């Protein structure tokens, strides 16, 4: 499949999270600490996963990076830019594709361009991205006519058409069956390798994190801190039954078990 020639590989940016903490107000009026002094650097074009117990603050960190929340303390930078709000240079894909049911697949992908007021100039890119995610034959279809994996590919195309330097993936494959999930892991990797976008993936699936990532950040229960960062030095494509793969899996399980007991 041909990949559209785009500037996004050159536009991939670094990310820095500097001593960030985040608290919310609990129903009883007390402070509820979600994140505690998180510091993290992500290289341009890197694929990094966040793994940790449910409710530990992984999605909160992603929302801070997206500019949808503000930190209680610390700061975040995308490249040299202080993150102070949402930006088209930071795309976000959720577990639910959030497609507009009354719009065709083509028009769902166009939404981001329309919001930025550049649809007329870049209308041709919609066709390119339909081809990129293998849905050119479904351009006139509606979301209810797609499978879960196909709908998630539309969500990825909608995020990527803005050429974000950073793409944030919040459990985007979590609702899919095991077979479709593995196929979509390869699909996301293909898009990442073709476009060079910096990607951060939140996942509860340890095998998914190892299969896809350059590095894996292990987070503690709330208030989340970084327990350890693991370099995944395995050749691609990766074999889930390889002894080195299984050794990393064992290490992560032990870290998560230790973090929950600490």
List the model feature ranges, each with a label.
Residues 74-86, 122:
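Conserved ABC transporter NBD signature motif
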Residues 103-111:
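Short coil-to-helix segment of the ABC ATPase nucleotide-binding domain corresponding to the Q-loop/switch region
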Residues 66:
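Helix-to-loop junction immediately C-terminal to a conserved catalytic motif
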Residues 156:
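Hydrophobic anchor residue at the start of the ABC signature
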Residues 51-53:
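The feature captures the beta-strand-to-loop junction immediately N-terminal to the Walker
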Residues 141-144, 162:
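Conserved signature/switch motifs of ABC ATPase nucleotide-binding domains
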Residues 110, 117-138, 190:
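Conserved ABC ATPase "signature" region
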């Amino acid at each position: 499949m041909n990949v559209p020639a785009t500037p996004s590989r050159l536009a991939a940016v670094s990310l820095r999270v500097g001593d960030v903490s985040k608290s919310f107000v609990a129903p009883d009026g007390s402070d509820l600490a979600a994140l505690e002094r998180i510091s993290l650097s992500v290289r341009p074009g890197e694929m990094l996963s966040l793994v940790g117990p449910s409710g530990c603050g992984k999605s909160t960190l992603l929302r801070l990076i997206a500019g949808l929340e503000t930190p209680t303390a610390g700061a975040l930078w995308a490249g040299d830019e202080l993150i102070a709000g949402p930006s088209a240079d930071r795309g976000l894909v959720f577990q639910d594709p959030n497609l507009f049911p009354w719009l065709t697949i083509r028009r769902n992908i166009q939404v981001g361009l329309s919001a930025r007021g550049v649809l007329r100039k870049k209308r041709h890119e919609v066709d390119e991205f339909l081809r990129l995610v293998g849905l050119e034959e479904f351009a006139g279809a509606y979301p209810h006519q797609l499978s879960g994996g196909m709908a998630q590919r539309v969500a990825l195309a909608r995020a990527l058409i803005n050429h974000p330097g950073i793409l944030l993936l919040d459990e985007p494959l979590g609702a899919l069956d095991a077979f479709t999930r593995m196929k979509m892991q390869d699909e996301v990797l293909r898009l990442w390798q073709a476009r060079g976008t910096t990607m951060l993936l939140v996942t509860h699936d340890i095998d998914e994190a190892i299969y896809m990532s350059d590095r894996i950040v292990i987070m503690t229960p709330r208030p989340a801190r970084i327990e350890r960062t693991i370099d995944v030095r395995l050749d691609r494509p990766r074999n889930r039954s390889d002894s080195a793969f299984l050794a990393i899996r064992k290490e992560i399980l032990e870290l998560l078990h230790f973090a929950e007991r600490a």
